[in-house]
A protein has these predicted regions:
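Membrane-interfacial loop-to-helix junctions in multi-pass inner-membrane proteins
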Residues: 477-481
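C-terminal, helix-dominated tail/subdomain
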Residues: 508-544
Length: 547
């Protein structure tokens, strides 16, 4: 694709996944860098790497390093949908209360009889952690930890015992592995022990040949048993020294340099299919990866990453604070005209999308692909009343158009599960999406009515389909997604009702997300946001039908 140079701050109408960090970029070479002079002490200080399937938060502690690990399909629960069949009977009653101005009573009735009863969707969950312990390195100097946005790698460097050590961390776009490359400026100095742990249930940790293996099953949630089977597998190659796996610990001794390779696989194949073989997939993936030396895999990863990241350059001026750590620049941003920090924040958003939304993978959740909790905030799901959309605001405008593919796959999936929900809850044709979905593509109205009684998520999703066509002019793509746009419109057309107080057609009940009105409720009729979304969708469907 054509390289684009953006010279205006107006290009910063973008959003990033919810990972805290920002930092100092540059103009040429390896210059877009987030850097720090101390290890991470908490999860939000660790640095994110990812290839859309595997994510890691890298702490960079010299004596006891930690990589918190995620695999995109490790979610609680199992295939299901959560539409409430009671809704079809009670929605007309809720609507009548709205017409009477009894908004609080309408909202309470909807919470009791319209919202999902089985579950509110499943949480995204962690695989666990890789710990790498380096004996004798508790004392160190000259510490530096950085995330290079130009090469999509984290680097940790420090001096201990008179030896300079360096670690490179990559979640490879060219192979489904995370690599940790260990070097020193003196031969025979790489000695460490690596092991994996997990907060998940029924976990088994073992050694197989020169590999360590951790397998388990995802967690229960809201009475739904977890059925995602997963296997994590790691090994190491060295120049000099030895590698031994014993009792679930990978032992590297006296190496000149070493590379740890790690992969994770699950039995997930599709939202309604968990028949995959995680054991076989993980074994084959790891064995294929170690056939190539680190330098070769690193170059392949770099080439693929740069083919996407390198399309856009934003130049806001000279970097005046390159010698300052990123956390200092963030802390003092309000005191300085640090335009370069703004530039890097823009590129950091693009980096995060590249790390979380490659074609053929799941879309980024509320936290991208990075999560260390079994029950994260808002379950780290796909929240469709702005958050999922926000993740993709940079995609077209920042020249990452093909990274919309995971979102479009999700839309296709929820158009299937949402068809069942439309019939069950509303007695309507077409498909419906409320304000959240998950790996299993549930489409029922979840949580309580004040936040979840919102049936126009499909209209907002469809805007991204139309936007992609406008940016690409791809008529074949438009033809392939037209049924999803049309059927989202069909549902809304069939569920619109005439307000007896003014004879206008509108959606009722609904709400304006996170925006209560003076009647001590959010439940309402004909909210402005719905009107705008419906107008856009109907207009786009009509125009698409003529192309």
């Amino acid at each position: 694709m054509k390289r684009i140079i953006l010279l205006s701050a107006a290009a910063l109408t973008l959003a990033t996944a919810a990972i805290p960090a920002a930092a100092a970029p540059g103009k040429k070479g390896n210059s877009h860098i987030l850097w720090y002079d101390k290890p991470a002490t908490m999860w939000t200080e660790a640095l994110p790497i990812g290839n859309s399937r595997l994510g890691a938060m890298v702490y960079g502690t010299p004596a006891a390093d930690r990589l918190q690990l995620n695999e995109e399909t490790i979610w609680a629960g199992r295939p299901n949908n959560n539409a409430n069949p009671e809704a079809r009977e009670y929605l007309p009653k809720v609507r009548e209360l709205v017409w009477q101005g009894k908004y609080k009573e309408a909202q309470d009735m909807a919470t009791a009889h319209v919202m999902a009863k089985t579950n509110s969707g499943m949480p995204y969950q962690p695989f666990g952690d890789l710990y790498i312990n380096f004996p004798g390195q508790d004392n160190y100097t000259d510490y530096r930890r950085e995330l290079s946005l130009d090469s999509a790698r984290v680097v940790t460097e420090y001096k201990s015992g008179g030896v300079n050590f360096k670690r490179e961390y990559i979640s490879s776009l060219s192979g489904n592995v995370i690599m940790v490359h260990l070097t020193a400026d003196r031969k025979g100095m790489i000695t460490c022990n690596a092991n994996m742990i997990s907060p998940q249930q029924d976990v088994t940790i073992a050694s197989e040949g020169k590999e360590i293996v951790l397998s388990g099953i995802s967690g229960w949630h809201e009475g739904l048993k977890g059925k995602v089977l997963f296997t994590g597998r790691a090994t190491a190659t060295t120049i000099g020294g030895t590698v031994v796996s014993k009792d679930g610990v990978l032992q590297i001794k006296g190496a000149d340099e070493a590379t740890i390779y790690l992969t994770i696989a699950t039995n997930f194949r599709k939202y309604n299919d968990i028949s995959g073989n995680d054991t076989l997939i993980s074994r084959n993936t790891l064995h294929e990866a170690v056939k190539s030396p680190f330098a070769q895999l690193k170059q392949k990863h770099y080439d693929l990453y740069r083919s996407q990241f390198g399309r856009v350059c934003l130049d806001l001026g000279k970097d005046l604070y390159a010698d300052r750590t990123t956390d200092w620049r963030v802390e003092h941003f309000k005191e300085h005209n640090d335009e370069h920090l703004v530039e890097t924040y823009f590129q950091f958003g693009r980096y995060l999308l590249i790390c979380t939304s490659q074609p053929g993978t799941q879309p980024p959740t509320l936290q991208g692909i990075w999560n260390d909790k079994m029950l994260p905030s808002w379950d780290s799901k796909y929240t469709c009343n702005i958050n999922l959309e926000m993740n993709y605001w940079p995609a077209e405008v920042a020249n990452l158009s093909e990274l919309t593919a995971p979102l479009f796959s999700l839309i296709k999936d929820v158009s299937e599960t949402g068809r069942e929900t439309a019939r069950t809850m509303y007695g309507a044709d077409g498909w419906v999406l409320h304000h959240n979905t998950d790996l299993w593509r549930v489409t029922g109205a979840i949580d309580k009515a004040p936040s979840g009684l919102w049936p126009t998520g499909g209209a907002w999703m469809a805007q991204h389909l139309w936007e992609h066509y406008l940016y690409t002019g791809d008529k074949q793509f438009l033809a392939s997604v037209y049924p999803e746009m049309r059927d989202a419109a069909r549902f809304l057309n069939q569920t619109m009702v005439r307000n007896p107080n003014n004879t206008n057609w509108m959606i009722c009940p609904s709400l304006s997300p996170e925006n209560p009105h003076p009647h001590h409720a959010t439940t309402a009729a004909g909210v402005t946001m719905d009107n705008e979304l419906i107008f856009d969708l109907f207009s786009h469907v009509i125009e698409a039908s003529r192309i």
